[in-house]
C-alpha cells in the first residue's frame, strides 16, 4: 500500500499500539525500549577513564556535522513504479522508527545520568542521542518528499515500551549499531560502484551515517567493559550466544522477507544478509567473549531452511499452522546451539 498522510491525520487516526503506514505488527516490527536506568547510573567509569575520555572528545568534535547538509534535497531522482515506490517508502518508515527509538533510549539514559549527578555520562549519551535524532530527521525529510508525515514525538505514546535488563540493552545496542554499520557501508559501497541504482540523494549520506553507527558501537563496547560481570563466565557466553543468534535471525528474516528493497538497488538480499552477518560476527570479537564459529558453514547454510520454514508457517492454514511453527522453532533451536569460539576481547578487569 502506498500511504499519504499528514502528521495530524496519522496522529489522530492511530490508537494505542497502532502503527504508521507501511508497518505491520509482527515479530520484525521496530520497537521502543526501556531499561534499568538506576542501575546504569552506577556505572564505574574510572576503570575505563582513558578510553572514555578519548571517545568523549571524538563525540564532542562531531566530525560528521558538516557531512549532513540539512538543506540538501532528499527527493527521489528516479521515477519508480507504484510497487517500487511502496518498497522505498516502507524502508524509510521502518528506518525512521528504528532511529527514533534509538534517540529516545539514548536521550532517556542521558537524562537519568544527569539526574544521578553523572554529568560526563549524561553528556556522552546526549551525543549519541544527537546522532540518532539527526538520522531520524533525514529519514523524516525523505518521507515528507514522498508525501508521508509521521508524528514521531507522539508515536511512543501509541506503542508500549519493551523492558530489557541493562545487560540485554548493552548487548543488543552494540549489535544494533555494528550491524547497522555493516548494512550502511555495504549498501554505500554497492551504490558507489553502481551509481545508476541510487534512486535518491538520501543514499549519499550513508557513508557518514555508517561512521556514526560504528562509533556508537565502540561507545557501547566501552560501557560493557565497565560492567565486567556481563561478559564473564557462563553469563557472558549465554548472553553472547543469545543476542548474536537473535540479531542474526531477525536480520535474515527482515532482509529476505523485504528483499524487494535490496533488489530495487540491484543487491542480492541473500548474499547481502550473509555478508552482513559474517562481518558483524567478526567485528563482535572485539566486544563479546564468545562469537559463532562459521568455519563449517552450518550456521549460514541453515538460513535458507529457516527462511522457508518461516514463510511456510506464515502462509499455513489455521489447521496446519502449529505443525509449521514447530518445524520453524526446531530449526532455529538447532541454529542457536551451533558451536561458538572464544574471543580475545579486551577486558578492564
Curated annotation (Swiss-Prot):
Keyword Oxidoreductase tagged: yes
Q: Which biological pathway?
A: Porphyrin-containing compound metabolism; chlorophyll biosynthesis (light-independent)
Q: Which UniProt keywords apply?
A: Chlorophyll biosynthesis, Iron, Metal-binding, NADP, Oxidoreductase, Photosynthesis
Which Pfam family name is an example for this entry?
Rubrerythrin
**What HAMAP family does the record point to?**
AcsF (MF_01840)
Give one GO molecular function term. magnesium-protoporphyrin IX monomethyl ester (oxidative) cyclase activity
Which domain of life does the UniProt lineage start with? Bacteria
Stretches for region Disordered:
1-22
| Family, as annotated | Belongs to the AcsF family.
Name one process (GO BP) from the record.
photosynthesis
Top EC class, one word: oxidoreductase
What InterPro entries does this protein's entry cite?
AcsF, Ferritin-like_SF, Rr_diiron-bd_dom
- Asked if Cell membrane is a keyword of the record, the answer is no
Listed EC numbers: 1.14.13.81
Name this protein carries in UniProt: Magnesium-protoporphyrin IX monomethyl ester [oxidative] cyclase
What catalytic reaction does the record list? Mg-protoporphyrin IX 13-monomethyl ester + 3 NADPH + 3 O2 + 2 H(+) = 3,8-divinyl protochlorophyllide a + 3 NADP(+) + 5 H2O
Which cofactor names does the annotation list? Fe cation
Q: Signal peptide position in this chain?
A: none
Function comment? Catalyzes the formation of the isocyclic ring in chlorophyll biosynthesis. Mediates the cyclase reaction, which results in the formation of divinylprotochlorophyllide (Pchlide) characteristic of all chlorophylls from magnesium-protoporphyrin IX 13-monomethyl ester (MgPMME).
